[in-house]
Amino acid sequence: MASILLSIKPEYVERILSGSKKYEFRKRLASKPVEKIFIYSTAPTMQVVGEVQVVGTISASPTALWEQTKGSAGITRDKYRKYFKGCKVAHAYRL
């Protein structure tokens, strides 16, 4: 299993580290199975601030993925839909 470094906006970093955001959404997954994500908080923080264990991944249509994850998504539906606009498949790392 691999470890990866992901750039994440500070508002989402806080939610991940507090445990209220249990999914990290991505348009693509890493090519190898991921065991750990090192979190790089983007501007204004601009540094690695922590790490989280990955317990699995989910891939589905954006609508189906939202229905599965919305309770602990840590993101508004509007921002989620904007991020995945035009995508046929959406992915999430389960944290």
Predicted feature residues:
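Structured alpha/beta reader/binder surfaces that contact nucleic acids or chromatin modification marks
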Residues: 1-94
